[in-house]
């Protein structure tokens, strides 16, 4: 049996880039909670002792940007300079302007257009992917890397591993078998965890705790064997982290946010963007399409692409590839996708309820992945029953 190795990585919520994603989405939540028609394009950057939010926001909402920044940093665990940032004493810079009137008239006619007439907020192409290798219909390498990162945060916050600090990265290599286009995981080849820690702990303690409290509860035993390689804090020291260790920027972790290197990516980031931005809404609807195709049994693995022009509601193109795993030809599946999914941005926002913010709805997406999550707020993860005429075999 011929196998191959494939690797996916993740970072947890204390990574500086992910901190920025979460602040941008916390701002989006705050705007949408008060004004569902808010137009938000919010970027965040951070470095030692400083966070800046900037971008274009048009909203009726009254938003205290500085409070959102400090609250988000504090919730993640950035409460002192020692851990990489002090939420209550860092500098917060805000430079936010209104959306360009040129963009506004072209996209939503200064809020006069009906939902089905709303144009895409920009050009671009987005991909959705699904695979039957996990219950989430997501790639195993990505699922494990993501869950290890989430588990690191859990054991830090609940006191199981008090030596942990907020910043950390994970990476998982899985050995796969290609079953006529479908991906079948055989075993976990390598697990890599690099996590920020305090001065009190030894490398041996770090390795023992990570194996016992992080890896064991997350990686199913059937995938581990005596040959599995573990790299646990291989650099030997990771005390300085968060924005003190590296600068952070919104939209720098787009592969972690999606499919861990599987499928494809059009390059657009998600966080800090309202649903007229097709980078986000387009990627969400094609995930629902790909997932629904696989869940319905039409294919074991599927990718869907959609593309847009600024100001134009209808997509320019829709593409489907099932990697040879389709029960019917791809062109038939493409027809089913087009008949069952409305790719116009205004209709995506309605069908996936994307104008509803608040309650950390989008903040939750900004760490540990936008896809494969069981949470009613992740409306794009709901499998849509597909209507089509059954072709008799």
Swiss-Prot record:
Reactions catalysed according to its record: L-methionine + ATP + H2O = S-adenosyl-L-methionine + phosphate + diphosphate
Similarity remark: Belongs to the AdoMet synthase family.
Known pathway: Amino-acid biosynthesis; S-adenosyl-L-methionine biosynthesis; S-adenosyl-L-methionine from L-methionine: step 1/1
Gene Ontology cellular component annotations, sorted alphabetically: cytoplasm
Organ and tissue specificity: Mostly expressed in roots, and, to a lower extent, in hypocotyls and cotyledons.
Induction data: Transiently induced by elicitors from Phytophthora megasperma, salt stress, and sucrose.
PANTHER family reported in the protein's UniProt record: S-ADENOSYLMETHIONINE SYNTHETASE
One GO MF term: metal ion binding
Thermal behaviour (record text): Optimum temperature is 37-45 degrees Celsius.
Pfam families referenced in this protein's UniProt entry, alphabetically: S-AdoMet_synt_C, S-AdoMet_synt_M, S-AdoMet_synt_N
Protein name: S-adenosylmethionine synthase 2
Activity regulation statement: Inhibited by products of SAMS reaction (SAM, Pi, PPi), substrate analogs (cycloleucine and ethionine), and alternative nucleotides (GTP, CTP and ADP). Strongly repressed by PPPi.
Residues that, per the record, bind ATP: 15, 167-169, 235-238, 246, 252-253, 269, 273, 277
Residues annotated to bind Mg(2+): 9
Oligomer status and interactors: Homotetramer.
Binding site for L-methionine: 56, 99, 246, 277
Swiss-Prot/TrEMBL keywords: ATP-binding, Cobalt, Cytoplasm, Magnesium, Manganese, Metal-binding, Nucleotide-binding, One-carbon metabolism, Potassium, Transferase
Manner of cofactor binding, per the entry note: Binds 2 divalent ions per subunit. The metal ions interact primarily with the substrate. Can utilize magnesium, manganese or cobalt (in vitro).
InterPro entries, sorted: ADOMET_SYNTHASE_CS, S-AdoMet_synt_C, S-AdoMet_synt_central, S-AdoMet_synt_N, S-AdoMet_synthetase, S-AdoMet_synthetase_sfam
GO terms of biological process kind: one-carbon metabolic process; S-adenosylmethionine biosynthetic process
Annotated K(+) binding sites: 43
EC numbers for this chain: 2.5.1.6
Alphabetized NCBIfam families for the sequence: metK
